């Protein structure tokens, strides 16, 4: 290979909010598995010293006890609205584990919670919860609407993490 990186961080992937996850199930599973598969295997070939991949909070069962424990992974059904994305992220994590065992690939899988920050997708239909709610609130305000549509039942607990905090966690994980 022309490049011999010291570290590879798989941050690429197809992401979206509830609407996008429900509508583009095949795209979410195919694109995310393809990205992870190609990069993980390239790291094996290049003998990359360190690889970080990302899982997702949605990898955990829909009815996992809160706060979620790492041990609850793969213990129950996933949230149907983002099952394809969750399965793709689980596949990436398991692939890292298998490549570590068989090929001694030095990898770690970080599982951040819901991210937000600069450059986010503020589309009310395809964005994640914080940016899409911000956009919907803004549109309601400028249009003088008295109501704001919020999707879901309101029952799920969510945690949020600013991308700068994730960056700090990545640096820590690499040390």
Language-model regions: role of each:
Residues 10, 37-82, 108:
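Conserved Rossmann-fold NAD(P)-dependent oxidoreductase catalytic core, especially the SDR/UDP-sugar
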Residues 17-18, 53-68, 84-90, 101-102, ...:
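Conserved catalytic-site region of short-chain dehydrogenase/reductase
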Residues 101, 115, 130-148, 158-175:
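Alpha-helical substrate-binding/gating segment
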Residues 81-85, 113-128, 152-164:
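Glycine-rich "substrate-gating" loop/helix at the edge of Rossmann-like oxidoreductase active sites
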Residues 35, 39-43, 95-96, 169, ...:
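Hydrophobic positions on the long internal alpha-helix
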Residues 38, 62, 80-113, 132-143:
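Active-site Tyr-X1-5-Lys
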């Amino acid at each position: 290979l022309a490049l011999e990186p010291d570290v590879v961080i798989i941050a690429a992937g197809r992401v979206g909010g509830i609407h996008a996850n429900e509508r583009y199930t095949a795209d979410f599973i195919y694109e995310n598995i393809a990205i992870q598969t190609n990069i993980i295997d390239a790291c094996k070939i290049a003998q990359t010293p360190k690889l970080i991949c990302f899982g997702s909070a949605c990898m955990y069962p829909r009815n996992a006890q809160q706060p979620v424990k790492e041990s609850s992974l793969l213990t129950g059904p996933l949230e149907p609205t983002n099952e394809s994305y969750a399965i793709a992220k689980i596949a990436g994590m398991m692939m890292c584990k298998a490549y570590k065992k068989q090929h001694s690939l030095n990898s770690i899988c970080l599982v951040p919670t819901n991210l937000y920050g600069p450059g986010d997708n503020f589309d009310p239909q395809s964005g994640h919860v914080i940016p899409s709610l911000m956009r919907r609130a803004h549109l309601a305000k400028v249009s003088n609407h008295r109501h704001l549509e919020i999707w879901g039942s309101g029952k799920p607990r969510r945690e949020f993490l600013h991308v700068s905090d994730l960056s700090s966690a990545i640096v820590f994980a690499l040390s």
